[in-house]
Design a protein with these regions (language model features):
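Extreme N-terminal starter segment of soluble prokaryotic enzymes
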Residues: 1-6
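Short glycine-enriched loops at secondary-structure junctions
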Residues: 69, 93-97, 191, 197-200, ...
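Phosphate-binding site of ATP-dependent enzymes
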Residues: 119, 128-130, 138-225, 229, ...
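Residue-level detector of anion-binding/catalytic polar loops
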Residues: 34, 131, 190, 239
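ATP-dependent carboxylate activation and anion-phosphoryl transfer catalytic cores
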Residues: 218-287
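A generic structural signal for well-ordered alpha-helical segments
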Residues: 28, 81-85, 125, 184, ...
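Conserved N-proximal alpha/beta basic substrate-recognition cap immediately N-terminal to
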Residues: 11-116, 120
Length: 287
């Protein structure tokens, strides 16, 4: 009997998102797995059995959440998943919620302030002539990322007015990031590959914002950071992540369906999705 993996994918995901929902199921199918793809919106619970569109899941399967679905009902869906027995997750439900965002990895970041208080952020920016990067705590695709200094107080006030319920990250600008940051894909306990993301506008390297990609090797300083994060991901039961580094600093850890597999394929002319699937299977000890 084939092992089963279930992917949760929201078909309404914006078009600048990645194609993991295509690459990863194909990779598992090549490894003789049965793959199913469901919209997280269609989840229900009957007598402690998860169903999608009235179809019960196998007693045992591997679940890979490639997204949350609608924000308003995310906690309800994750509560159902978290309390259902006999399921194994590529990344645990609790960590998808608790480790999604910059705060979970603050010890590896450059000087960083995280706050919902605009006055606290302005106080830090106004304390000198330093350059900073201001971005949403749980942002993605490089949206709403701004390079700021003490001349940009009006912009900061405007951003906080537009998003009054949002926490923001103020991070000291990393000198050298204009030359690019390195994205490293981690699966299971293995480094799958790394590539350079060079920003189009001097500091936003996200490919969705026009960043350029090329082959690279992890520098010694960046490798030290990545090698400290890999075992922590495993301890937290986070099976798939993208780790962004620059000049020996962590820029970000993305654990919610991070892009990078197709970029690795583009720059190295090699399919990394099967290597990713094998690393997940090995980490989960599934034969």
């Amino acid at each position: 009997m084939k092992p089963v993996i279930l992917f949760l994918h929201d078909p309404s995901t914006k078009p600048n998102a990645n194609n993991n929902h295509i690459l990863l199921p194909n990779a598992f199918e090549e490894l003789n797995w049965e793959t199913r793809i469901y919209n997280p919106e269609d989840i229900s619970l009957k007598n402690n059995r998860i169903e999608f569109q009235s179809e019960p899941l196998p007693t045992k399967c591997l679940i890979w959440a490639l997204g949350f679905g609608r924000k308003a009902t995310t906690l309800d869906r994750f509560n159902i998943l978290h309390n259902a027995p006999n399921f194994s997750f590529v990344t645990s439900v609790s960590e998808l919620l608790l480790s999604h965002g910059k705060a979970s990895w603050a010890e590896f970041l450059p000087e960083t302030i995280i706050s919902q208080d605009v006055n606290r952020i302005i106080e830090e920016i106004s304390s000198g002539n330093d350059q900073w990067v201001l971005k949403p705590l749980a942002g993605s695709f490089g949206r709403s990322v701004h390079k700021v200094n003490n001349q940009d107080i009006k912009l900061v006030n405007s951003l906080f007015r537009e998003s009054p319920d949002q926490f923001w990250v103020l991070q000291r600008y990393i000198e050298g990031i204009e030359h690019g940051e390195t994205r490293t894909i981690i699966a299971g306990k293995e480094i799958i590959g790394s590539y350079l993301r060079k920003p189009e506008d001097a500091f936003r390297a996200n490919v969705a914002q026009g960043g350029q990609i090329s082959q690279t090797d992890l520098s010694e300083r960046d490798r030290l950071v990545v090698e400290q994060i890999v075992p922590r991901l495993a301890e937290k039961n986070i099976g798939f992540a993208a780790v962004d580094t620059c000049e020996g600093f962590l820029v970000e850890v993305n654990i919610v369906n991070p892009g990078g597999l197709s970029s690795l394929q583009d720059v190295y002319s090699e399919d990394f999705s099967k290597k990713t699937a094998l690393a997940i299977i090995k980490a989960k000890k599934i034969s």
